[in-house]
């Protein structure tokens, strides 16, 4: 007589789900068919069908590192399951994690993931990226990855803000700070509903990733120390990415709200609220010598930009030993901008370069087919009467840059729009940079 293996027998006879490796202390695996049990642990979600769900133990205190449990849970839930991080619980991550093996997995974050603030450890143990000397606690990769829930991903950034005060990230950064969430070689990754809090550096960085979507995510970086504000805590950044969708976002970070970096294409942004940011920026690109960078096919609509340094911005590097490329086919539509230093900006003298050096070594990034449509609000007056500052590089092609129905005011007087070295006009009256007082 043929006997089924015990795991198959139990599954067939009793519907019991058998873990792929032995359970670790505090863990649980609930079959998708156990509706009542899933409901009891908080694993059901109105938008997503039930799946086999894995839970792990929560941290007992701020020093109780559950990194190995978290990694185990992801491996158990991989290939069709779900990892649940329970509401009201905190899961402390104190070791770097390579999560680039994921395939068809859901992470339901209802509690809080919190990283330790051991600066010495993280600066010695991280994943390093040459681009702007970036590091991260962990990296996510694979395909068909969904992260959703009402929980918090907490970078525990206050100690990093305090230690970093007075230092500079570009170009001479030596004080590396981790990125809160990084994807690398990922395809079809979505994040929905969660809060991302107090990243030490950029909040999100997508690298070599296709089809990334964020919806209804709140990103916030704040300091409890008035002398050490968060720095370089961009909301969203990308490098070598095709296919981006950011919808219904609230971002309050003190740096770029959204800033696609080199070779990001096919971007859709809708219903984004940005407070205290450096704006929705295309770039910077053209930083590295001999490299061609592209940002192309971008549609941004229904965005509110409040109390920021910049509003709608395009930025490209100038100077010796920089690169080249293009920013092409970008639409900013239905944008409200209030109390912002520079509401509309084309900056081709980026980064930290004086006017003499920029004139000697101008940017080689072409800016083409840019539309600013239905833009209204006010500047802060910090740049005088200027509400739009579009100064193109004499060594670049700048054409088909259009302002349509732009109604921006300045508290310093009649609003001025600056434009230089743009071929064919911009659709409205503008003056040369040399004729204005800043």
UniProtKB/Swiss-Prot annotation:
Q: GO CC: one term?
A: extracellular region
Q: InterPro entries attached here?
A: Glyco_hydro_28 (IPR000743), Pectin_lyas_fold (IPR012334), Pectin_lyase_fold/virulence (IPR011050)
GO terms of molecular function: galacturan 1,4-alpha-galacturonidase activity; polygalacturonase activity
The biological processes this protein is annotated with in GO are: cell wall organization; pectin catabolic process
Q: Spans of the PbH1 repeats?
A: 209-248, 295-316, 327-348, 398-430
What gene codes for this chain?
Answer: pgxB
- Which residues are connected by disulfide bridges in this protein? 257-274, 392-398
The organism's lineage is:
Eukaryota, Fungi, Dikarya, Ascomycota, Pezizomycotina
**What is its subcellular localisation?**
Secreted
Q: What is its main location?
A: secreted
Q: What is this protein called?
A: Probable exopolygalacturonase B
Keywords of the record, alphabetical order, are:
Cell wall biogenesis/degradation, Disulfide bond, Glycoprotein, Glycosidase, Hydrolase, Repeat, Secreted, Signal
Q: Name one Pfam family in it.
A: Glyco_hydro_28
**Record: glycosylation sites:** 118, 185, 225, 263, 275, 302, 329, 354, 366, 400, 407
Its function? Specific in hydrolyzing the terminal glycosidic bond of polygalacturonic acid and oligogalacturonates.
Top-level class of the enzyme under EC nomenclature: hydrolase
Q: Where does the UniProt annotation place the signal sequence?
A: 1-15
Q: What is the source species?
A: Aspergillus niger (strain ATCC MYA-4892 / CBS 513.88 / FGSC A1513)
Q: Which family does it belong to?
A: Belongs to the glycosyl hydrolase 28 family.
What EC designation does it have?
A: 3.2.1.67
């Amino acid at each position: 007589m043929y006997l089924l293996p015990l795991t198959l027998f139990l599954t067939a006879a009793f519907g019991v789900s058998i873990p792929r490796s032995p359970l670790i202390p505090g863990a649980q695996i609930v079959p998708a068919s156990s509706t009542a049990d899933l409901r009891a642990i908080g694993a059901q979600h109105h938008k997503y069908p039930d799946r086999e769900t894995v839970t792990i133990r929560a941290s007992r205190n701020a020093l109780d590192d559950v990194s190995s449990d978290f990694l185990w849970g992801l491996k158990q839930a991989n290939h069709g399951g779900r990892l649940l991080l329970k509401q009201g619980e905190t899961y402390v991550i104190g070791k770097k994690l390579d999560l680039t093996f994921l395939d068809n997995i859901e992470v339901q974050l209802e509690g809080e993931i919190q990283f330790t603030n051991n600066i010495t450890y993280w600066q010695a143990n991280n994943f390093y990226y040459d681009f702007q000397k970036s590091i991260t606690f962990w990296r996510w990769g694979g395909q068909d990855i969904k992260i959703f829930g009402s929980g918090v991903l907490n970078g525990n950034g206050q100690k990093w803000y305090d230690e970093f005060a007075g230092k500079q990230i570009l170009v001479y950064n030596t004080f590396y700070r981790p990125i809160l969430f990084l994807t690398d070689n990922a395809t079809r990754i979505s994040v929905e509903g969660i809060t991302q809090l107090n990243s030490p550096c950029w909040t999100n960085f997508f690298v070599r990733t296709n089809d990334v979507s964020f919806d209804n995510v709140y990103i916030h970086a704040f300091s409890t120390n008035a002398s050490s504000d968060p720095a370089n805590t961009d909301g969203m950044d990308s490098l070598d990415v095709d296919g981006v969708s950011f919808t219904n976002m609230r971002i309050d970070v003190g740096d770029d709200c959204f800033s696609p970096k080199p070779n990001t294409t096919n971007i859709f942004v809708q219903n984004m609220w940005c407070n205290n940011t450096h704006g929705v920026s295309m770039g910077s690109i053209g930083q590295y010598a001999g490299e061609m960078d592209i940002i192309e096919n971008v549609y941004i609509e229904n965005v509110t930009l409040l109390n920021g340094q910049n509003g709608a911005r395009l930025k490209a590097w100038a100077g010796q030993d920089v690169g080249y490329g293009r920013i092409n086919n970008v639409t900013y539509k239905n944008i409200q901008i209030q109390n912002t230093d520079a509401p509309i900006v084309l900056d081709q003298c980026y980064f930290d370069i004086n006017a003499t050096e920029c004139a000697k070594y101008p940017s080689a990034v072409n800016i083409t087919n840019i539309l600013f449509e239905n833009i209204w609000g006010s500047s802060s007056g910090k740049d005088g009467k200027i509400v739009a500052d579009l100064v193109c590089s004499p060594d670049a092609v700048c054409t088909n840059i259009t302002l349509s129905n732009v109604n921006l005011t300045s508290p310093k007087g009649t609003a001025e729009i600056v434009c230089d070295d743009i071929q064919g006009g911009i659709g409205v009256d503008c003056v040369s940079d040399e004729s204005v007082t800043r």
